[in-house]
Regions:
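Gly/Pro-enriched, hydrophobic low-complexity segments
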Residues: 1, 86-124
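Solvent-exposed helix/loop surface patches that form functional interfaces
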Residues: 4-89, 138-141
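Short, hydrophobic/aromatic-rich segments at coil-to-beta transitions
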Residues: 14-17, 83-91, 111, 160-165, ...
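Divalent metal-coordination and catalytic microenvironments
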Residues: 110, 167, 183, 188, ...
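Extracellular/periplasmic ectodomains of large secreted or surface enzymes and adhesion receptors
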Residues: 124-166, 199
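Histidine-rich, glycine-flanked metal-binding segment
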Residues: 174-215
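Divalent metal-dependent hydrolysis catalytic cores, especially in the metallo-beta-lactamase
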Residues: 230-247
Length: 247
């Protein structure tokens, strides 16, 4: 948004050094690793894709930390006049809280072909712009399927009665924490709070809080929701949001 960019990275032997407008670092690095820039551009994906293609395990260590992985989640045939080519939709994970989707050329050393943020941004190789809308549609479908797959892996449906045992309930109205209690839930609602007893009273699911504090769901009063934000909110304890729209 117009802020100055001043970022450098160097590696000499096993020492890596970097400096940005936000931080600076110096660390020892063994073997192959690539710097994850703070103020880079989408074109950096070309470097990442090429480096990943040379890794037999499909994993690329990152500097300062983390590991980048890639998975092909789709393909498309794009056309420019009489010319056509096949490009792959690649999902990159390991940078940020959500995957990044990029379109890559199909080659031994792939490069970035298109970077799309549907409804907001389209970057595509010169001359192939007419394929942008079709690629965006395919990308949205692949992203939706990725979210469905994630939900199937991490969701834990709690049918019937759930007991949260030995929890200390936070009272937000009086800013106090109560004694150990057993909290019963049914269909997503608290039905009863009783003194901790160690009994399960026929509950279908039992979670042992181990004396930890049980907080009510948090409210986020200023959000601009995207497709991946729901899971991130839940992970942070936020159960209610007010979306300020995305215009």
């Amino acid at each position: 948004f117009g802020a100055p960019v001043d970022e450098t990275f160097t590696r000499r032997g096993d020492r890596a050094r970097w400096k940005t407008t936000s931080d600076a670092g110096d660390q020892r690095v063994e073997g192959t690793a690539i710097y994850s820039s703070l103020a880079g551009s989408p074109e950096a994906a070309t470097v990442l894709l090429g480096a990943l293609a040379k890794r037999p395990d499909g994993r690329l260590p990152l500097i300062p930390s983390g590991t980048l992985t890639s998975r092909r989640v789709g393909e498309a045939t794009v056309r420019r006049g009489e010319e056509s080519r096949t490009v792959d939709l690649v999902m990159l994970t390991g940078v940020g809280f959500t995957p990044q989707f990029v379109w890559a050329t199909r080659a031994a050393s792939p490069r970035l072909f298109a970077y799309l943020v549907p409804g907001y941004l389209k970057l595509i190789e010169e001359g192939w712009q007419e394929n942008g809308a079709a690629l965006a549609t395919r990308q949205q479908a692949a992203e939706a399927q990725a979210l469905v797959d994630l939900e199937r892996r991490v969701a834990h449906p709690l049918d019937g009665v759930t007991l949260i045992r030995n929890a200390r309930v936070f009272d937000s109205e009086h800013a106090t924490v109560g004694p150990p209690a057993d909290v019963y839930l049914f269909r997503g609602r608290i039905t009863e709070i009783l003194p901790a007893s160690g009994l399960d009273a026929g509950a279908d699911h039992v979670l042992d809080a181990g004396g930890r504090v049980l907080l009510p769901g948090l409210f986020d009063m200023h959000t601009h929701l995207g497709r991946w934000d729901g899971g991130l909110h839940l992970a942070a304890g936020v159960t209610t949001v007010r979306d300020m729209a995305n215009g």
